[in-house]
Amino acid sequence: MILTFIKIKKYRIKYLIIKKQKAFGRNNLGFITCRAKGGGIKRNLYKILDSNFANYGMSFSSAFYVNIIYDSFRRIFLAVYFIINSIIKNIYRYFLLTKNLKIGSQINFGFKAPLKIGNALPLYKILLGSFIYNIEIRYKGKGSLVKNANHNAIILMIGDIYVTVKLPSGEIKLLLKNLFCILGQLEIRRKVNKNIKKHAGFNRKLSIRPKIRGAAMNAVDHPHGGGEGKASVGFKFARTLWGKAFKGIKTRKKNKHLSRFILQHRL
């Protein structure tokens, strides 16, 4: 029965693909919030990921891993899942690719799912020292943490209310024990040792625009600007275009209400 799913020719599913336009470093008002961004190769087809964990097993509780697909917007390959027990027939979903997961294997979702690589489970059901990814922050929300290639989190301790998790950045955080995640590690995208920056203007294809130093500007345009000749910055710490200190200063707000759940800040 599994072999019949693998015989499908194309996995470019129309109802899971949308047109997405880049922001080019602008916000909703059109002002530049991130400098030196713009241009690049045109990529319209954005594949929608299912990060809802199948509504905790209510919409469907199991699926088959069918095939691997390339995604130009992410640094990781995607897995195509064929949903089994759903109300609507012939449904496919895109998920992040789990390491050491074989094509044709069955994936389960929900509180009753067994301890198996690729399954979506609550945090309190997973063993200590296990690798997890695609972790929720809020209950019945979407998976938000650890979604990039070759990044994994580790469960350190399970308590009555909270679970202690170590993130890839080195931050140790408390999360509610009923939050969902996926058991296993994320697959690594293979890199080829090839010099891709061999032509002039290749950075423009990577959406990198020329960046002008602040010291080369006038005093009106940048905090570092102005002065006769090669003048110094004039501050103890370097400043951004909007006057905010950076390079050696922590910019996280001290009175953030989520800071009490951080046991150890990132390195």
From Swiss-Prot:
It comes from the Eukaryota. One of its GO terms (molecular function) is structural constituent of ribosome. Gene3D superfamilies: 2.30.30.30, Nucleic acid-binding proteins (2.40.50.140), Ribosomal protein L2, domain 3 (4.10.950.10). One of its GO terms (cellular component) is apicoplast. Pfam families: Ribosomal_L2, Ribosomal_L2_C. It is found in: Plastid, Apicoplast. Keywords: Apicoplast, Plastid, Ribonucleoprotein, Ribosomal protein. The keyword Ribonucleoprotein applies. The keyword Aminoacyl-tRNA synthetase does not apply. GO terms for biological process: mitochondrial translation. InterPro entries: NA-bd_OB-fold, Rib_uL2_dom2, Ribosomal_uL2, Ribosomal_uL2_bac/org-type, Ribosomal_uL2_C, Ribosomal_uL2_CS, Ribosomal_uL2_dom3, Ribosomal_uL2_RNA-bd_dom. Its main location: plastid. Part of the 50S ribosomal subunit. Belongs to the universal ribosomal protein uL2 family. PANTHER family: LARGE RIBOSOMAL SUBUNIT PROTEIN UL2M (PTHR13691:SF5), RIBOSOMAL PROTEIN L2 (PTHR13691). This is Large ribosomal subunit protein uL2c.
